[in-house]
Amino acid sequence: MLFSEQLKKEAKPIINQIYHDPFIQGMLHGNLPTEATKFYLRADASYLNEFANIYALLIPKMGNLNDVRFLVEQIQFIVDGEVEAHEILADYVQESYNEIVQEKVWPPSGDHYIKHMYFNAYAKENAAYTIAAMAPCPYVYQFIAQEALRDKELNKDSILAKWFEFYSTEMDELVIVFDNLMDKLTKHCSEKEKNEIKQCFLQSTVHERNFFNMSFNEESWSYGGMKNE
């Protein structure tokens, strides 16, 4: 079994939990609360900006020009392409996407996730650590989207079905490239290093779950019992 396949196998129980948590189930049935949807859009706008920055940190660690070119294309996709998925959610709540994201949020779970990725990008020389921190994001979206399209419970009359359709294919190339890079970059790693990389991947998968739950619950910072508004 390839190392990338092993990572996905071990992450599957977490991804199954994500699928059955309230946020994705709300999308599946077409009844995701409006405020949870808007909170997700605001949080994800901040997250994707940082995700693009982490791609930029990953580029100098790449020794292959084709890999560099692909990462540059992914930055462009984050800037332009992924907005299409966000527009679907904005249409669902019948508000302008640009107006929704004018209000900024930086919740605890999103903060922890982003710092987890930055830590691995800065502290670890081997790019496998950075990729392990980043790869669960596209893989989780691909998996839950494809699972939803197979699910008889999917509300096909809801515009949210288009969100699943978008992610069911848009992540395919990125997942393949990340898998190939992961297998190549860990080929000569020690078992200790591979275990660290695996933990990094699984932690990011947990962060993905926390991000969806954070959005559903409209999570905020609490200082001494007082919420920071």
UniProtKB/Swiss-Prot annotation:
Residues that, per the record, bind substrate: D44, Y141, Y167
Keywords on record: Hydrolase, Thiamine biosynthesis
Swiss-Prot/TrEMBL site (Increases nucleophilicity of active site Cys) positions: Y47
One GO term (biological process): thiamine diphosphate biosynthetic process
Superkingdom to which the source organism belongs: Bacteria
A Pfam cross-reference name: TENA_THI-4
One GO CC term, this protein: cytosol
Enzyme Commission number(s) of this protein: 3.5.99.2
GO MF term list: thiaminase activity
Role, per record: Catalyzes an amino-pyrimidine hydrolysis reaction at the C5' of the pyrimidine moiety of thiamine compounds, a reaction that is part of a thiamine salvage pathway. Thus, catalyzes the conversion of 4-amino-5-aminomethyl-2-methylpyrimidine to 4-amino-5-hydroxymethyl-2-methylpyrimidine (HMP). Is also able to catalyze the hydrolytic cleavage of thiamine; however, this thiaminase activity may not be physiologically relevant. Therefore, is probably involved in the regeneration of the thiamine pyrimidine from thiamine degraded products present in the environment, rather than in thiamine degradation.
Subunit: Homotetramer.
Similarity-based family: Belongs to the TenA family.
Protein name, entry field: Aminopyrimidine aminohydrolase
Organism: Staphylococcus saprophyticus subsp. saprophyticus (strain ATCC 15305 / DSM 20229 / NCIMB 8711 / NCTC 7292 / S-41)
